[in-house]
């Protein structure tokens, strides 16, 4: 009649905080959150059920209840905030924290969650009860709260030296231990080996203070939960085992936990010594006992699956005996599951790191093989230093002699000094100077000016392309429009610089009669010459005597004899095109050239034929 009304949330809250759970079951926790959000009075009933669970004497039930309350505060809004900040719930927290039988981990978890809820409810003054309860708990239990994080200070040289000394001492002890084990194994005294190894293992822990340097500490256990406040810090919970990597700051080390790497404060952890030989033997013995019960577990399972429903289990002694024998190994089995689960995670992380390192190495190796040193294969070809042969220009066929020397086609640029071609190269006029009397350049007449008989000045024919032979000097070369001459350089001028130093000094030159008649006829008809007159100012005097041979000497008839002996030539000697070596010098009479400006006098053959 006076029995309290059953709470609808007792079952689902008890399911989410069951003592048999190995960890928080978030599926059950979220089911409670969904039901509270859908019910108007769900937050009040759920908090009442959690107060009952806090009175449970099992520490796991109390810890799971704190996680459920924290999930309600984050997912159910102001309705859950109001019930969590109520006097009934805060009083239940204070009673549990002040109880001397409460586990220290439960007390620290109470203080941690009350701090979070105080910050969460600070914007609403109606929820000030939680803040007052938190301040009261801190004043009554100052040792519950986790220590403050130390400042990050750089490691001094003295600290580095101390770390190195501890490392050397640990290495020396390890070497001593190995030597002791080897000597005892040779003596055959197994009992003495166990005693010596145990003492050797205990020596480093006695000689090295706990938590001094990272050189001698491989693992630490978390004493408190740590929430990172800056990038690079490692998050962990109380009880986690952290692998130590190195020391970074004065009171901060770098460690690895569940695949994450970061720094953590030393006052939040405690050093874990490496297991001794005795501890390893106890672990191996415990594993052997667990695996020895496998047959009994399988036998018990077979009996229970084949028994009839009418069978009374309590009366069956075999089933009862098997059940109690297998029940004793359950705590050991859970411990081994946790141990090998941790090892499995460590091996998985190690494998992932190895795979990543191998991929990075292969990528770098492939990149170094596919990108060799810079080569010059793809560079464009450099242009030649000589001008192309005149035969490549349209309208000027080139009669190159076979097997010419490369020097014959080289023509320096105007800014370069010309190179003299060999005087006796086959294919040049005057290759045999002993058969032709060549006058020196000082005795060569200048027929470009008007003669005494009124003959007009010979126009200067300039090549349409740079000369090929060595006749060209450093003067600027002009390029007039294309003409119909095969070898226009032969008619450029009549003055040549003879390369023969022993030629006669007083030979007189004049035009051939046919040439003179042609010039007079051109002057009478008023035809305009197609070649520009020579200007001494345009071309500087040659710097070296030219190897260009002059025209063949004929008996002077008309006009009157004229001789010129200038002190030095004031013009550029014109080069002549090459002629096939099979063609010799012309031995007949001199024939005049007819300019192409008049149609009736247009040449019908190569102009070079007049000189052969």
Curated annotation (Swiss-Prot):
Residue span(s) of domain UIM: 162-181
Lineage: Eukaryota, Fungi, Dikarya, Ascomycota, Pezizomycotina
Gene source species: Coccidioides immitis (strain RS) (Valley fever fungus)
Role played: Component of the ESCRT-0 complex which is the sorting receptor for ubiquitinated cargo proteins at the multivesicular body (MVB).
Biased composition (Polar residues): 182-199, 413-423, 491-508, 597-612
SUPFAM superfamilies assigned: ENTH/VHS domain, SH3-domain
Membrane topology designation: Peripheral membrane protein
Gene3D superfamilies given in the database record: 1.20.5.1940, 1.25.40.90, SH3 Domains (2.30.30.40)
Segments of this protein annotated with the region Disordered: 176-212, 372-612
GO biological processes: protein transport to vacuole involved in ubiquitin-dependent protein catabolic process via the multivesicular body sorting pathway
Location of the VHS domain: 16-145
CC annotations in GO: endosome membrane; ESCRT-0 complex
Subunit and partners: Component of the ESCRT-0 complex composed of HSE1 and VPS27.
Alphabetical UniProt keywords: Endosome, Membrane, Protein transport, SH3 domain, Transport
Name of the protein in its database record: Class E vacuolar protein-sorting machinery protein HSE1
Family, as annotated: Belongs to the STAM family.
CDD domains, sorted: GAT_Hse1, SH3_GRB2_like_C, VHS_HSE1
Matches recorded under Pfam families: GAT, SH3_1, VHS
Biased amino acid composition, Pro residues: 538-559, 566-578
Gene it is expressed from: HSE1
Domain SH3 residue range list: 215-274
């Amino acid at each position: 009649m006076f029995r309290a009304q059953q709470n609808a949330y007792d079952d689902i809250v008890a399911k989410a905080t069951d003592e048999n759970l190995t960890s928080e079951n978030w599926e059950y926790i979220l089911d409670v959150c969904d039901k509270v959000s859908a019910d108007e009075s769900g937050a009040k009933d759920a908090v009442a059920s959690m107060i009952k669970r806090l009175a449970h004497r099992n520490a796991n039930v109390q810890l799971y209840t704190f996680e459920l309350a924290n999930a309600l505060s984050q997912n159910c809004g102001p309705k859950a905030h109001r019930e969590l900040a109520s006097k009934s719930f805060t009083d239940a927290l204070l009673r549990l924290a002040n109880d001397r039988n409460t586990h220290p981990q439960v007390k620290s978890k109470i203080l941690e969650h009350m701090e979070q809820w105080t910050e969460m409810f600070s914007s609403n003054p109606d929820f000030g009860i939680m803040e007052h309860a938190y301040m009261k708990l801190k004043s009554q239990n100052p040792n519950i709260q986790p220590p403050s994080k130390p400042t990050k200070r750089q490691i001094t040289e003295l600290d580095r030296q101390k770390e190195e000394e501890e490392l050397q001492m640990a290495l020396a002890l390890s070497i001593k231990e190995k030597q002791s084990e080897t000597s005892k194994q040779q003596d055959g005294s197994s009992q003495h080996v166990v005693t010596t190894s145990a003492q050797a293992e205990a020596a480093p822990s006695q000689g090295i203070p706990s938590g001094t340097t990272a050189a001698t500490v491989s693992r630490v256990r978390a004493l408190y939960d740590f929430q990172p406040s800056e990038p690079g810090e490692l998050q962990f919970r109380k009880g986690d085992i952290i692998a130590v990597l190195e020391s970074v700051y004065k009171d901060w080390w770098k460690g690895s936990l569940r695949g994450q790497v970061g720094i953590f404060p030393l006052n939040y952890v405690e050093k874990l010594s490496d297991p001794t030989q005795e501890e390893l033997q106890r672990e191996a013995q415990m594993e052997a006992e667990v695996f020895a019960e496998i047959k009994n577990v399988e036998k018990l399972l077979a009996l229970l699956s084949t028994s009839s429903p009418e069978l009374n289990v309590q009366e069956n002694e075999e089933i009862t005996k098997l059940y109690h024998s297998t029940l004793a190994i359950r705590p050991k089995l859970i411990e081994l599951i946790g141990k090998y689960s941790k090892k499995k995670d460590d091996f998985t992380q190690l494998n992932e790191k190895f795979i990543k390192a191998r991929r990075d190495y292969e990528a770098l190796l492939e990149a170094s093989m596919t990108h060799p040193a810079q080569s010059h294969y793809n560079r464009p070809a450099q242009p030649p230093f000589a001008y192309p042969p005149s035969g490549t220009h349209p309208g000027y066929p080139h009669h190159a002699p076979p097997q010419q020397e490369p020097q014959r086609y080289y023509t320096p640029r105007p800014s370069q000094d010309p190179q003299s071609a060999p005087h006796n190269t086959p294919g040049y006029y005057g290759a045999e100077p002993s058969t032709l009397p060549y006058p020196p350049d000082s005795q060569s007449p200048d027929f470009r000016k008007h003669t005494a008989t009124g003959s007009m000045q010979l126009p200067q024919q300039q090549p349409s392309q740079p000369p090929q032979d060595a006749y060209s000097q450093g003067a600027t070369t002009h390029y007039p429009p294309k003409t119909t001459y095969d070898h226009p350089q032969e008619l450029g001028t009549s003055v040549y610089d003879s390369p023969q130093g022993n030629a006669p000094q007083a030979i007189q030159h004049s035009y051939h009669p046919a040439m003179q008649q042609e010039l007079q006829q051109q002057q009478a008809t008023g035809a305009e010459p197609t070649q520009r007159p020579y200007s001494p100012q345009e071309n500087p005097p040659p710097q070296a005597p030219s190897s260009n041979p002059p025209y063949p000497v004929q008996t002077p008839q008309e006009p009157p004899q004229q001789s010129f002996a200038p002190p030095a030539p004031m013009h550029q000697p014109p080069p002549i095109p090459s002629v096939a070596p099979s063609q010799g010098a012309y031995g007949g009479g001199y024939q005049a050239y007819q300019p192409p400006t008049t149609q009736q006098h247009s040449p019908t053959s190569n102009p070079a034929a007049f000189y052969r």
